[in-house]
Regions:
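Extreme N-terminal starter segment of soluble prokaryotic enzymes
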Residues: 1-4
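Glycine-rich Rossmann-fold phosphate-binding loop(s) that bind the pyrophosphate
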Residues: 9-10
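N-terminal Rossmann-fold NAD(P) dinucleotide-binding loop
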Residues: 13-14
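Conserved N-terminal Rossmann-fold NAD(P) cofactor-binding segment
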Residues: 34-72, 302-309
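Rossmann-like NAD(P)-binding element
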Residues: 51-114
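Rossmann-like NAD(P)(H) cofactor-binding subdomain of soluble oxidoreductases
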Residues: 88-154
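C-terminal substrate-binding/catalytic lobe of Rossmann-fold NAD(P)-dependent dehydrogenases
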Residues: 134-140, 149-313
Length: 313
């Protein structure tokens, strides 16, 4: 029997739980939220699609009773507040750090061997906090951001090439932010051939730019942050763990010398399986890409340093 807990029943969390159920990633999904009745309602709504969608996964909604999350193989953390008007970045980090730290303490109390997938923002910083505040081995804390950013890259590539998104491949490394992510065009292909054979440098640059502002574009259109792709991206990471897929997924991982970096969590290509991050792939990237990665590193370190300034770590 496999079990996944999703903490936070908002748009991203509920979408994630729905994708997990429809794809029958686990036998049981526990959706938990602090708001009375909210997770129960979302879970009931999902379960009422079971016959329509043909899945057998059981989704249970819970209000703030972490004992019901016991025995989870994977815990996906989506809880946290969005940045409100007038709120400084430091204030946002302080609030969300407190939420994430409290949640992690609770889930590990009942599922001490769970692998944690962090979605809460700022994602690289929250993954770093989770790892160091709890003293977990680095394979058990995974930041979801690269999976989402890479999905967006593939979407914009498919639009430029006028092809199916499943015919293109590519991924994004670096921080999960519109100025810190690095779409690796040198590893981007269409049916196994580098996309530079099909797109002009200008067209490829437009794909890169669209990817980097992908989240902001959706916020402008929707009036709020996106949730469909983020929820599905988190579910895809959980699926790779539960099904031991040994799948290459770009994720925010703790580095111990890879790419010349230590004491940081940042997006890099990882092999994801039953043990979480089973391997970090150190690719032969160009000097330009490496320089961009170190620029991203500096930005991520600056944000992560706020945790120590606030005495959270």
């Amino acid at each position: 029997m496999s079990k996944v807990t999703v903490v936070g029943a908002g748009n991203v969390g509920a979408t994630c739980a729905n994708v997990l159920a429809v794809n029958e990633v686990a036998n049981e999904v526990c959706l938990i939220d602090i708001k009375e009745g909210f997770a129960e309602g979302k879970a009931m709504d999902i379960m009422q699609t079971a016959q329509l969608m043909g899945f057998d996964t059981v989704v249970e909604g819970v209000t703030n009773d972490y004992s019901r999350t016991a025995g989870s193989d994977v815990v996906i953390i989506t809880s946290g507040l969005p940045r409100k008007p007038g709120m400084t970045r430091e204030e946002l980090i302080g609030v969300n750090a407190g939420i994430v730290k409290s949640v992690c303490d609770q889930v590990l109390k009942y599922s001490p061997n769970a692998i944690l997938v962090v979605v809460s923002n700022p994602m690289d910083t929250m993954a770093y906090l989770t790892l160091h505040a709890l003293g977990l081995p680095r394979n058990r804390v995974i930041g979801m951001g690269g999976a989402l950013d890479s999905a967006r890259l593939k979407y914009f590539l498919s639009q430029a090439l006028k092809c199916n998104a499943n015919d293109v491949d590519g991924f994004v490394i670096g921080g999960h932010g519109d100025t810190t992510m690095i779409p690796l065009t040198s590893y981007t292909t269409y049916k196994g051939i580098n996309v530079s054979e099909f797109l002009s440098p200008e067209e490829l640059e437009n794909v890169v730019k669209s990817t980097m502002v992908g989240g902001a574009t959706l916020t402008g259109l929707l009036g709020t942050s996106a949730w469909m792709a983020p929820g599905a991206a988190a579910a895809s990471v959980a699926e790779a763990i539960i099904k031991d897929q040994k799948k290459m997924i770009p994720c925010s991982a703790a580095l111990e010398g890879e790419y010349g970096m230590k004491d940081i969590t940042i997006g890099v290509p990882c092999i994801i399986g039953k043990n979480g991050i089973e391997k970090i792939l150190e690719l032969n990237i160009s000097e330009e890409e490496r320089a961009k990665l170190h620029e991203s590193e500096a930005a991520v370190r600056k944000t992560t340093a706020i945790l120590k300034e606030l005495n959270v770590l």
